[in-house]
């Protein structure tokens, strides 16, 4: 629910994003942050991105990505971006519906910030647990990995989404991990979003994951179920390679984070509203930790996941 399947940065917005992220690679043979190709290679980075990615440079047909090597994450587990804060033990619940083929079905999502971390591509990441229910039945549960860089931008480092049918686990074919099998991580939330900015959320050619986000509005006020939120940020997510997916419209408000999800176009539309924010106690966290660790172990059946270390409890 929180990360879709798309990616591209417009040349017009790239300069602004690069300024925020302390340097970008140039299209083609350039390097991130002004580093030489040799220096980038010695750091284990792609010459075109500056990030610790598979060799071979940026994917064909895309512009260069903002720099995001491990050296830019000195406190990656401190995710305090006001538009997407990830405090340990926080659980967000969203209620809404899925509309498909003219039919509407009840839909809900719980998103929990666990007390676990996971090393991904040289960076310690926050492990979040996302559970997606349709008509009360579990459809998908996902481990998502996030880290905040030194500029305050929150990055996607990978996902392990388990799919279910009739309550039975059917597989996790959309798993991706930054730096494995040609996968590139991307930005989940900018530190200083401004109207018109476009940014990548992730690019994984192997599973056709290709997310593009555009900041469409800032400083808005949105009222939901009697609660009014100020300084609301509106982001449009879409997939250039999949026109049938339409657009997902997300609303963020500080210091809460995501408060609403809407849709425009597409064969299947998701609508969600934040209904509760809880801070879980030790007993609940212990139970969640057990379930998430079990998922983490199951994930090692997938080749790209084996590039990571097992999730561990944060100190």
Q: Where in the sequence are the language-model features?
A:
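C-terminal motif of bacterial Sec signal peptides marking the signal peptidase cleavage site
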Residues: 19-23
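Bacterial N-terminal signal peptides that target proteins for export
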Residues: 1-14
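Conserved functional acidic sites
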Residues: 25-28, 33-37, 44, 50, ...
């Amino acid at each position: 629910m929180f990360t879709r399947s798309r990616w591209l940065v417009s040349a017009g917005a790239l300069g602004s994003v690069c300024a925020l992220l302390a340097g970008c690679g140039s299209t083609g043979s350039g390097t991130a942050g002004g580093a030489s190709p040799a220096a980038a290679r010695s750091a284990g980075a792609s010459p075109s991105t500056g990030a610790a990615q598979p060799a071979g440079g940026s994917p064909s047909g895309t512009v260069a990505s903002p720099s995001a090597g491990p050296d830019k994450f000195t406190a990656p587990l401190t995710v305090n971006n006001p538009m997407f804060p990830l405090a340990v033990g926080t659980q967000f619940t969203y209620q809404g519906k899925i509309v498909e083929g003219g039919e509407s079905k009840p839909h809900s999502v719980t998103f929990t910030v666990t007390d676990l971390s996971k090393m991904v591509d040289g960076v310690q990441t926050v492990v979040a647990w996302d559970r997606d229910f349709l008509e009360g039945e579990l459809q998908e549960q996902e481990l998502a990995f996030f880290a905040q860089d030194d500029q305050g931008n929150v990055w996607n480092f990978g996902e392990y989404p388990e799919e279910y049918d009739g309550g039975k686990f059917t597989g996790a074919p959309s798993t991706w991990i930054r730096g494995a099998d040609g996968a590139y991580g991307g930005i989940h939330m900018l530190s200083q979003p401004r109207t018109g900015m476009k940014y990548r959320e992730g690019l994984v050619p192997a599973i056709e994951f290709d997310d593009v986000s555009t900041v469409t509005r800032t400083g808005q006020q949105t009222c939901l179920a009697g609660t009014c939120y100020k300084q609301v940020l509106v982001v449009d997510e879409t997939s250039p390679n999949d026109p049938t997916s339409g657009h997902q419209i997300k609303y963020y408000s500080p210091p809460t984070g995501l408060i609403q999800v809407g849709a425009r176009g597409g064969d299947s539309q998701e609508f969600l509203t934040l209904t509760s924010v809880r801070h879980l106690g030790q007993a609940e966290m212990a139970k969640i930790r057990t379930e998430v660790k079990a998922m983490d172990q199951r994930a090692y059946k997938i080749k790209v996941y084996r590039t990571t270390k097992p999730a561990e409890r944060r100190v």
